[in-house]
Design a protein with these regions (language model features):
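Bacterial Sec-dependent N-terminal signal peptides
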Residues: 1-32
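Carbohydrate-active catalytic/glycan-binding domains of CAZyme proteins
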Residues: 20-369
Length: 369
């Protein structure tokens, strides 16, 4: 199935979200290289409205933002992440009716593999409970907001064709693996695990799924008001550089809980990603902040920002994007997309810091300074 692309403006930017303008108050100014220049600021959320399950891809100086739309898949393209709210959003694909992927299009991710763009997304059959599965689209245009997206089909383990969402790509030594969140079987509904499988090509698995994370801790089992079966979802790969440890960052507990959070598992040195025992060091890494009114932070993506200083040295920052709510005990409140800088611990593990309040000045990514 191929779809022509439609483009429209995301939303008018409000007065309070003037992204990365020079600060007008001297008390919030800071120095950057070269000395004497004022830092530019932005405020979260970086885009208006409900944008759950945010994801960012980047290539050739452009950032591509995706989030759950439900009925279609759209991409917003920008050169500056702090100005995402000004970006044009392009609807790149709308599913046909009466298929196994016609509704509930969730958590799309955009990846550039083997010279082409691929979108991985969850979807379901209208009127059929628990029919959520993962699917793949392909586009050979250099710009994923242009050209045609071709439906490649369902990506799944044929021996274990179970409920599946939140698919992503993990690449190790030029080999791609598919990671996702799913059920063990239909008799154990609503308990979500993280699975991994090797890939034959960008739309086909070459081996059976392997479970690499199970919700065993209380912090992985929060529903809005009680402990449930447990949820691990939204897996995404993270590695500082080729000599650093490999992590899968995932979201834990039910998305509607204030205690929804980010967590990690780490592939041990020289470990086999298809061996469950080689995934170690599970722990929470980013949680709610009652003080800063950030609740249910999770389902994140990553991007980098780079700039060359006047000495010819390249400086690179790591950032993450995530969704959260700004009111407690309100599971139906829209989830907004926010970005924060990611730093690193001495052992190569990520340091997400604390969740930052909305509406406060945050220095822009370095490529915007």
């Amino acid at each position: 199935m191929k779809n022509k692309i439609l483009t429209f403006l995301v939303a008018a930017i409000p007065l309070f979200a003037l992204a990365c303008q020079k600060s007008k108050t001297t008390d919030t100014s800071a120095k950057v290289d070269p000395p004497g220049e004022k830092v530019k600021y932005f405020k979260n959320p970086v885009i208006n409205g409900d944008h759950a399950d945010p994801y960012v891809a980047q290539r050739d100086g452009s950032y591509y933002f995706l989030a759950t739309k439900g009925g279609n898949i759209a991409i917003a393209k920008t050169r500056a992440m702090s100005q995402l709210n000004l970006a044009n959003e392009t609807v790149v694909w709308t599913p046909p009716e009466n298929t196994d992927h016609s509704v509930d299009l969730w958590a799309p991710e955009l990846h550039f593999l083997s010279g082409k763009w691929y979108i991985y997304f969850a979807a379901a059959q209208r009127g059929v409970n628990d029919s959520n599965r993962m699917f793949v689209l392909e586009n050979d245009n250099a710009d994923p907001t242009q050209g045609e997206w071709t439906f490649k089909g369902k990506i799944f383990d044929a021996a274990n064709d179970e409920w599946a969402i939140d698919g992503s790509i993990l690449t190790i030594a030029d080999k791609n693996y598919f990671v996702w969140s799913g059920w063990e079987n239909a008799n154990e509904k609503y308990k979500q695990y993280i699975y991994i499988a090797p890939m034959l090509n960008p739309w086909t698995l070459s081996g059976p799924r392997v479970k690499i994370s199970s919700p065993t801790n209380d912090w992985e089992k929060w529903e809005p008001s009680f402990l449930g079966a447990g949820v691990n979802e939204g897996p995404i790969a993270l590695q500082r550089d080729a000599n650093s440890p490999i992590f899968v960052i995932f979201s834990a507990s039910r998305y509607s809980s204030d205690n929804y959070c980010l967590a990690q598992i780490e592939l041990k040195k020289d470990g086999n990603p298809l061996m469950p025992e080689d995934w170690i060091n599970k722990k929470q890494v980013f949680t709610k902040s009652d003080k800063n009114m950030v609740f249910g932070p999770g389902h994140n993506g990553f991007f980098t920002s780079s700039s060359t200083n006047d000495k010819g040295e390249q400086q690179t920052e790591n950032w993450f994007i995530y969704h959260a709510r700004n009111m407690p005990n309100n599971p139906n409140q829209p989830r907004t997309s926010r970005i924060q800088k990611l730093t690193w611990n001495n052992d190569g593990s990520p340091n997400f810091g604390s969740a930052t309040s909305t509406g406060v000045n945050i220095p822009c990514p370095i490529d915007e300074q």
